[in-house]
Amino acid sequence: MERNPYPTDLTDAQWKLIEPFLPPPLPGGRPRKTDLREVLNALLYLVRSGCQWRMIPHEFPPWKTCYNYYRAWIDNGTWDELAASLRMDIRCQAGRHELPKVAAIDSQSVKTTEQGGEERGYDGGKKVSGRKRHLLVDSLGMLLAVLVTSAAVDDAHAAPELFARAESEAFPRLRTIYADQKYHNYDLYQWVEANTDYRLHIVNRPPQQRGFVLLPQRWVAERTFAWLGRSRRLSKDCEKLITTSEAMIKIAMLHVMVRRLATATPAPEFSYQAKLAA
């Protein structure tokens, strides 16, 4: 059915990047009638606009159909496989090795909605009741791993699980991880030394400096949160389940990556590249 396009619709070039990773129809049964491109368009509309599932426009496939594909692609690893391939393409496009050597870790506390759900708590430092998003990104700001916890969880206590998700098999070159003072924790240092090949580097603000300070080694992680902030679905954590909360972050990042690849516009370099060459 012909319809007027939405700003979030995939272009032909973007669709060509994604289509090979979508699972084929299961053998047997009647032929698939659902247009998977329209399913993805609906999911991108949902994440960018922040609407509820039942408020997905009627031009798209039924919301239950879209939700079922969304959950199926979480369970079978489609989102992760697609993100890994696009990330490597972006790194190669920028003249980098497809596997990172350097990463940055950071977190963001966000409010949850009144519907409740798993893993909610209070972040006393940020004065936020809800959940905390922990991200590990490469030197271009591309997502390597994501973990969602209660906002009450300390950043240093969540870091081991986040690092464990960045498996050595997936990132064998990864050695240096930049972090801020929240990760200056003796137990974390001990865990990293005993369980990984990483070197955790704490980036300190200049002496005598007060207020906000732009730290080049960590600015890349803040920029990734800014990219994600364009998606209204992420302005709060609207999900009941942690797995779906993490999936929404991956979809928002997926949209960033396909738009960058399809337009062939590499991410701008950030300062002190000699220290952060990856």
Please report, for each region that a protein language model flagged, where it lies by residue:
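Short alpha-helical elements
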Residues: M1-A278
